[in-house]
Amino acid sequence: MTWTVEFFEDDQGRQPPREWLQSLDSAKRAAAIAAIEVLLTELGLDVCGTEHGKQLGAGLFEFRIRHDESVIRGKAGQASTGKRNEVLLRIFCHAHGQKIVLLLGGYDKGVAPSRRRQGREIEIARQRLRAFKLRQSGRRSAARRRR
């Protein structure tokens, strides 16, 4: 069974992870989309048992993209559309519900490899996860009151 991928949405209706993904150059965006389609939707949280994932605690995990689209699709036996490019991306995620992976944020570690930058990005993802959980608990409470 495959996992569904959703983008975090803030109170203003913006989806910062989607905006970040769209801001990447075409080669990096293609690698990220391929990794999401080939790895994340198939493995979900189990991606943390591979080189592509790492548990960060408190419901947050890191999805690591180290290969370009051609390598990712090639490993899955799929045809690629482009030439090889260097890629080092991180996407922060949360697994919830019935096989849903929520994308909370991401950054290009190849451009900004410092631990400080990674720490800031993880904290942003944690803040978004807290906001998501608050909204979810509010929806459940409202649904119970309507019954």
Segments and roles (model prediction):
Residues 95-103:
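Active-site beta-strand-loop-beta-strand hairpin of nuclease catalytic cores
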Residues 89-94:
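Short, surface-exposed beta-strand/loop micro-motifs that present aromatic residues
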Residues 1-87, 108-147:
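Basic, Lys/Arg-enriched alpha-helical interface segments
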